């Protein structure tokens, strides 16, 4: 049996079902597994994606039946991903793109958020819980739509999504504002993503709110990557990338592969760390940041400073100054719940913390870092297209630029391509040297004409869909939204 405990309190021990149903520990810590399971990597590399997903996830979700996980993975990673689940595309030499945007909402979040609703429903069955689950989601763009798509019309669940007003692309906003379903709600929040995320976290940590909702038979949960159920499915595609390189004869078994990950909340790259700890021959995990380069500074100096200028960039899903999942890594490296609790207390009270030199050294054994300016992002999009014929979005461009700086001779580099370029058509079109129309749908059509590529049907169809949600609130209003729900 695999148990989980809080990064801030060892004594708070839960099962996988409890961790997924609850989302966040009561004192604000994140749930982490008690150990890293060791797996037969060679055997896993022989499996197709659904079977691989079931095998990896079952190592952690030990209170779920293996038959359930196998069926859940089979139904999740089939037609909805168009046969391209975990697709690895060659780009240049031994640099590859792991294209994670072939799912229903055209972003990597689909890998977790198409499976996670099934995990939540099963968790409630495992725990004999019958209450309504209220899911609160803070999003910088992609998580919101992926969560709405995964959870819409799931029985016994309500979901409310909060995004920073003006802090997403227009396509991302419309994906959320037009979402269908009787159990969904979307709110724009004045401020940036960190304001929205902090507001949601405060609701989770407010015992009075929890008590009032409990009186109505409602329990809070999260679909953000603070929830273990969001993180564990993302481990799978690191194994899938390695398996494809192995099958193509690009590596021999046991050879290291480096991964460069465009990073905001630190969940996607942390999944790579878990894969490495499970035995996958991951070399370097390169953390690629945009102009909001708080993680680059931390990984370089050991000091995390969230109180800094915030930039709205062309890669909005990474416009984040408080990277929640870093807390999990700090726990795994230090092994001390008291130390992590102290660091998070310092971050909350002063906006910064500094880790011990030996902690930073331990992190640097697995992680490297770099960042890209807006000019470098645009240049990378154009260079990849003109040189390699590869069309990428702004977030992948951040990572391609950093990957080129960190590439090791003879070691394959896999860049995680996290979103379709058609989610950010104006930025991509302008990077290619074209004048972009103000309207995103006209820009999408112009990008199709300029590149000969076809926009995903789900994005093009947004133009015909009616907007359902337009409410704008202050961060403090998130609590009022939560308290407005009835069983």
Over which residues does each language-model region extend?
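PLP-dependent amino-acid enzyme catalytic core
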Residues: 1-487
